[in-house]
């Protein structure tokens, strides 16, 4: 399972590539991760204002809300240039103009949620 240092390294690695970029599309190849992935089409055209971490969750803040990503036991995020073909365990692409943020999760224990409002009010982050 990615521990806090790995999650922070992931955040720091993806932030310069996607902060300030507009999400043009997303493609969910495998809806059955830890919980079903259901992203609203309304996030297309929204800009990623910030990339943060709360515990082991990565937060992609947008004007209408926040994408909350957990890498599970074996998940990873990577920046993919152009239209690189997905591998077997690439379950989600968040597409921007010139690149994609790709979630790879062989064991499918990761999760991706969209939450309107502040992420601290989402049931996964609420204390």
Stretches with model-predicted labels:
Residues 1-62, 95-97:
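Extended, highly charged segments
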Residues 67-127:
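Phosphate/anion-contacting hairpin/loop surfaces
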């Amino acid at each position: 399972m990615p521990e806090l240092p790995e999650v922070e390294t992931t955040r720091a690695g993806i932030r310069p590539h996607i902060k300030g970029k507009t999400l043009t599309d997303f493609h969910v190849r495998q809806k059955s991760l830890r919980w079903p992935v259901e992203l609203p089409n309304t996030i297309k055209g929204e800009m990623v204002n910030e990339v943060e971490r709360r515990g082991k969750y990565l937060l992609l803040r947008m004007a209408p809300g926040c994408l909350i990503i957990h890498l599970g036991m074996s998940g990873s995020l990577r920046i993919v240039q152009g239209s690189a073909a997905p591998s077997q365990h690439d379950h989600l692409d968040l597409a921007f103009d010139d690149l994609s943020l790709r979630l790879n999760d062989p064991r499918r224990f990761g999760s991706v949620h969209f939450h309107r409002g502040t992420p601290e009010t989402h049931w996964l982050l609420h204390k």
